[in-house]
């Protein structure tokens, strides 16, 4: 058997019969041989490696996304390198440079924080520069660019639907709890505001409540505002919604009889609290699946891949609402 044939088997070429492939793999297994991926990458001009970035791996949403991405990429024969960048622009830029230095085939960035503030171009310039070296895929964020692709939850429509449902149940003072002004958070706020306006309700600044996404911190901050009056809560994260439930418990407010609460992301928190939380499922699994499918298509030379895919959300109704 020639060296070229063995090389084709090791590198995953389809131009080898199954019988020959099995013979080579049997010898590799018997000898305990491990291919040098760096040498193989130089020969194939591909490391079969995807870089994945997120701001915080401890976040449940991020962890779920990473798990789904890694599993799906593995099925296509790709390995993954993970970088946790934090939220500062300098740290993000440094992680992008680090991953690109590993000769990754593509870069996946999870979370709205990578979309910048939507106003200043310099916030996302490093991503556009990175896309000149490798395809960039954003999950739940949006940047326009020739070699940049995005999969987004339809946060605007989900927020509009939640707010409208609360209004139909007679709610008039809907507190919007948020922790950032990322692309996703802005889409949710715009959906909330549009639903209020369409129903003829005023959009009140005192009902937009900004806090950290930390349960006890958010609860205590809400308690500190003595004149805060609301009959329902729509939170952009499940953790913030749980904070609202804890606020209600301290104040002796019954849920959902006196106060309706809706969270976001349908995380394990939504079924770990009492009462169980109505939450919007942003379908991160579907977003990741779409991202992987599109990445593979782009890397295979497909030029007709959509630069933006919108994934509809689902409201999972539980015990904190009566709609």
Residue ranges and their predicted role:
Residues 104-113, 137, 175-177, 226-239, ...:
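Periplasmic-binding protein-like
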Residues 219-323:
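Flexible loop/turn connectors
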Residues 147-176, 194, 214-224, 241, ...:
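Hydrophobic alpha-helical segments within soluble ligand-binding/sensing domains
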Residues 155, 185, 237-238:
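Helix N-cap/beta->alpha junction signal
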Residues 160-201, 206, 307-322:
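An alpha-beta-alpha
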Residues 73-84, 176, 193-215:
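Short beta-strand elements in bilobed, periplasmic/extracellular small-molecule ligand-binding domains
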Residues 45-164, 224-227:
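Alpha-helical recognition/docking segments in bacterial nutrient-uptake
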Residues 1-48:
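N-terminal helix-turn-helix DNA-binding module of bacterial transcription factors
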